[in-house]
Amino acid sequence: MGQKVNPIGLRLGINRNWESRWFPDFNKMPERVEEDNKIRKFLKKELYYAGISNIIIERTAKKLRVTIVAARPGIIIGKKGADIEKLKQKLQKLVGKEVFINIKEEKRPQASAQLAAENVATQLERRVAFRRAMKKVIQAAQKAGVKGIKVQVAGRLGGAEMARTEWYLEGRVPLHTLRAKIDYGFAEAHTTYGVIGVKVWIFKGEVLQKGIRPEPTERPRRRAPRRRS
């Protein structure tokens, strides 16, 4: 079962938190889900080169907070915050309500499964050999200190007439172990021969503590006590 199901969905409430955090009325549920999908698609298209690894959407009665986790936050913010204001206006026009945008930096982009999948897809579109693209991403992830990584590509690889699936695995990726922290990413490469699907699983270690850990908040720096002369 662990081999087939989405590893993030399987671990929700165990060691993964939801990416859409809100509680609507039952009648408004389809509308909110569709709106979240629109926001994610818009941001992915608008900020493709910023290297977005995750988008978290939180809602209150009248406000909407969007947290964007990106490898290159400077592209989103722009000079003196000009680009982020334009983005905010576009999002408000899209959803029709007040939007707050929070930007977080992805500190280890090589260890993000979504960014790794997009990296392989980009290389395939540039006609790089699929084996070379996969090995390059695996080496980068291992340097970032991950415990294991699996990369899978499926489609008309190398322009072959018949589609097939190829994958590489380095280290451990225990998909059945629920306490294992598994990151998962998917991307599509649009080539002249057709669409090639890219899937990446990254094992980051085991979470032995039960429940979802709260996100770490930045603590104010304490000043060192002055010495009396």
From Swiss-Prot:
The keyword Ligase does not apply. Keywords: Ribonucleoprotein, Ribosomal protein, RNA-binding, rRNA-binding. GO terms for cellular component: cytosolic small ribosomal subunit. GO terms for biological process: translation. Transmembrane segments: none annotated. Pfam families: KH_2 (PF07650), Ribosomal_S3_C (PF00189). InterPro entries: KH_dom, KH_dom-like_a/b, KH_dom_type_2, KH_sf_prok-type, Ribosomal_S3_C_sf, Ribosomal_uS3_bac-typ, Ribosomal_uS3_C, Ribosomal_uS3_CS. Residues 39-107 form the KH type-2 domain. One of its GO terms (molecular function) is rRNA binding. Part of the 30S ribosomal subunit. Forms a tight complex with proteins S10 and S14. Binds the lower part of the 30S subunit head. Binds mRNA in the 70S ribosome, positioning it for translation. Belongs to the universal ribosomal protein uS3 family. NCBIfam families: rpsC_bact. HAMAP family: Ribosomal_uS3_B (MF_01309_B). This is Small ribosomal subunit protein uS3. It comes from Nitratiruptor sp. (strain SB155-2).
